[in-house]
Amino acid sequence: TGLTQKTPALLANEIARCRDMTDQPFGVNLTFLPAVNPPDYPGYVKAIIDGGVKAVETAGNNPQKWLPALKDAGIKVIHKCTSVRHALKAEAIGCDAVSVDGFECGGHPGEDDIPNFILLPRAAEELRVPFVASGGMADGRSLVAALALGAEGMNMGTRFMATKEAPIHDNVKQALVAASELDTRL
């Protein structure tokens, strides 16, 4: 997530580090939040473009303002949405794809609290752009379920918190691995 880096320069360093680890394409998430003193969004967008990133997952506020610069750089834009109406708006403004986040997601689940078993089929009925399922996805079984519900793929987020690459304290990682289905709080 781009905003976990305190400055665009730090994001550029992380993009370069990722580039050193793979010759495959990768994406960056950039969340646009309402703020009295917003982050340096133009700088973050420039770091993404200059870093040769191939895909950006935007989240939060409407990304329309940033689409021309990103698309002119050949970057695919996937907007994260927690409702079908927001997904349709993302499609209408020109996003290439949508990440449909059910209530099960580890981040902000939106205001409507719609679980994936309801949200994904509705998105499949309405959207013309590809979409991936997000929220509660963890393995191949999740992928099969997401595909059956109409998505073209899935996002995993929390699942990767326990990896050696994640800059998270080992106690937190161990707690995640040891957790049962009863330890999730929505």
Question: Model-derived features: where do they sit?
Answer:
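Active-site entrance/lid segments in N-terminal catalytic domains of soluble metabolic enzymes
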Residues: 1-127
